[in-house]
Amino acid sequence: MKTGLPTTVIGSFPKPDYLPIRDWFDSARDTGEMDSPEATRSYSAYRPSDADEALFVRAAEDIIALQIAAGIDVPTDGEVRRENYIHYHCRHVSGFDFDHLEHRVLRDGAYAADLPAIRQAIRHENAPYSPHDFTASQAVSPRPIKFTLPGPMTIMDTTADCFYHDKRRLAADLGDSVNREIRALVDAGCRHIQVDEPLFARQLDDAFAFGMDGLERCFHKVPSGAVSYTHLTLPTILLV
């Protein structure tokens, strides 16, 4: 019997109105821009409660059900806990400053934003956050879910480096921080893990110079049995 290719989604979904946080990009679009320092500062001040946890689980369950109803084989939790799919990871790693934002032009000039700054060496000194997020969402899914994480190059392009000034070394440290989460996910039972690196398609020279090494570092010593995904996006204009 022939079977089709398994289907999945990139990861994020619009946040339900009942959630206690807003999406970084949605907040920015309210002003017709792509920058929302208010959303960053609001999330920094946010302190989740037990009632909020129930809402995040409810949102994950609703979004997973939508995907399964649409025929998706490997759903995600919609990244419902994240105010920004990149910055959420950074908040769990030391070295990032979310109090004093830096203005930067990013995505090859596509837009400007006030971004968290790297002011010290990147160190993953706290317990991994991903096992909790994964197990809470997996508990309300009848199918194995996929967990998504930002890749080193994508993190680098959405933060302000005020410390390293060395892309290769920064990518290596960021890759190590993602690797710790991935290995913890596998230990928690996650078998579908995606690293988002849309910047590979925009910055080919950097992708070949150090991006591939950073991505490989993300999956270093990850036990066999886990299915790894890499999310790439094509730029608006392709020059051939």
Describe these PLM feature segments:
Residues 1-232:
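Domain-level signal for soluble alpha/beta catalytic cores
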Residues 231, 236-240:
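Single conserved hydrophobic/aromatic residue that forms the stacking wall/gate
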